[in-house]
Amino acid sequence: MSIDDLKLPSNVIDIIKNRGIKKLNPPQTEAVKKGLLDGNRLLLTSPTGSGKTLIAEMGIISFLLKNGGKAIYVTPLRALTNEKYLTFKDWESIGFKVAMTSGDYDTDDAWLKNYDIIITTYEKLDSLWRHRPDWLNEANYFVLDELHYLNDPERGPVVESVTIRAKRRNLLALSATISNYKQIAKWLGAEPVATNWRPVPLMEGVMYPERKKKEYTILFRDNTARKVHGDDAIIAYTLDSLSKNGQVLVFRNSRKMAESTALKIANYMNFVSLDEKAISEILKQLDDIEEGGSDEKELLKSLISKGVAYHHAGLSKALRDIIEESFRKRKIKVIVATPTLAAGVNLPARTVIIGDIYRFNRKIVGYYDEIPVMEYKQMSGRAGRPGFDQIGESIIVVRDKEDVDRVFKKYILSDVEPIESKLGSERAFYTFLLGILSAEGSLSEKQLEAFAYESLLAKSVVDVYFDRAIRWLSEHSFIREENNTFTLTNFGKRVADLYINPFTADIIRKGLEGYKASCEIAYLHLLAFTPDGPLVSVGRNEEEELIELLEDLECELLVEEPYEEDEYSLYLNALKVALIMKDWIDEVDEDTILGKYNIGSGDLRNIVETMDWLTYSAYHLSKELRLDDHSDKLRILNLRVTDGVKEELLELVQIGGVGRKRARLLYNNGIKGLGDVVMNPDRVRNLLGQKLGERVVQEAARLLNRFH
């Protein structure tokens, strides 16, 4: 279908044409035929890179032009939110105001009342509904992106909760290919539009070693075969693809494997032609950013100089952004990543090599599970870059020829797993009901039950969980019942607004009410022990050290030592997190923290963000519970966690551009507060440099005026 044939105003057509798009592709054409531009409710399922974002844009713009109101585009990841925001900014040229919001769950974001198109995450939208802002009533068109996240064990409950509310209004749902799309479409009250079309044809295959040393065969889906030679299967196929001027994405099942594989590949990159000027610019970018440990930067620099990088959640966001952008611009030729990359931003390559189909099982030591088919489809879907590649290749590496048939049948020839509700646990279901009551204000038992029946859970499962949830939430003072109507207690409403799990809130309340004011390590351990606390890897040797440390702590912990093995593992995990955070707030150098606890800079950032949220929540819960001894300490602790400083630097880190290192530099040179900054501008400029120093002096003066 030609763009000119669309029933859209000429200025809308022009924006699409300015992107170089003259014709709609098959999924886009099918969506238009099914009434996309008439506001029809649709569920579109198609592979990665098949143009779903343009479908959403056309649906939103057409709907808003006809009906007014607001459109909300929801994604499962912050990185995707940013990506979609940049795309939708194009529509500001014809008068639509576009905004993006994520994080900071304890706010109603009143500023969004002035915007027409809002890009956000599922968690953020869920939290906004709990705050009941008036502007959200104007939202009458929802795009639910990556709806297959309903099947994600961690994110699924929130995605389902948001979907239950959103499907009461106008809706466009977008998803990767799912096997039970007709069932999901019926649940949404939407018409299904299912297609397997891809912009670049995909060749899928399995690679196995021959008896002949250093020889590997790749058997493709169309029964063709190819042989490659080399010291290692992954390296051999990577070099084969690079020799044809392709880029390569290699997926490994752990961070260590990603890093070691990248190092191995780098040793073979001498024959690959690189843009040395571009590589130098990338290396300079790495030097310029403050985020990230020096060791990981040096390792990345040595790899990038050879056209290779690794990518995993342990890296800081700034480092990941540089790697992704350099790969998009074809400056980096190979990325070795963990599967988190496949679930995130769009980063296609000619060749995708899946080095492992097994994942470490966190619950059973030494046990590995095979990856879900959906995870394979997400990884293989990155193969083939539109505009650069005529074909994409996705290869699974197996250790033995005998595995080929089984792997072919399970991953290449099979449908993905059907989507099923992830609300079927006490933690998820209780949180869901709390969120619904917070958003609605008050509901009768039948009304509340009706929301639960709108989930994907079987009615029999809802019946089991509903009574149990109501009883637990009532007994623990989250909800109250009067005249057969349920409302939240003040405590329950505060918990819902803070966007923490009710089980987390209950653990915090018991910990604070059971003890008098305590020390930092005890507060940090309590919060890390909750269901919302961050998880870190604790090795066998570390366990022994942590057990010894328990006997030498400066104060009594606020959580009793558990007897069950699983609970005790979480108890030690919480202690490791608490120790990391104690070093952080005591201004221990970041490189030292990363090395001491064997974590990456991205891990540290995630731990800090989570503990920032939990210390903030604990402070506000202590205020709600009138536990003044605790609240004073928790307020200071939260501020210190936010910036990673001792209490004496809290005034200085309020100044924009002054982080923990610069604040310490100023303090150690006699600049101990805002007044000192304003009274000693020359000394500040000498310490921080003329440009930054001047900005800091002006900002300090502004803050002083505001306080007085």
From Swiss-Prot:
Motif segment (DEAH box): 145-148
Statement: the UniProt record of this protein carries the keyword tRNA-binding: no
Reactions performed catalytically: Couples ATP hydrolysis with the unwinding of duplex DNA by translocating in the 3'-5' direction; ATP + H2O = ADP + phosphate + H(+)
Enzyme Commission number, as recorded: 5.6.2.4
Motif interval(s): Q motif: 1-29
A Pfam family that the UniProt record links to this protein: Helicase_dom4_arc
Gene Ontology MF, one: DNA binding
Matches recorded under InterPro entries: DEAD/DEAH_box_helicase_dom, Hel308-like_dom4, Hel308_helicase, Hel308_SKI2-like, Helicase_ATP-bd, Helicase_C-like, Helicase_Hel308, P-loop_NTPase
Stretches of the chain forming a coiled coil according to its record: none
Function: DNA-dependent ATPase and 3'-5' DNA helicase that may be involved in repair of stalled replication forks.
Protein's name in the database: ATP-dependent DNA helicase Hel308
Gene it is expressed from: hel308
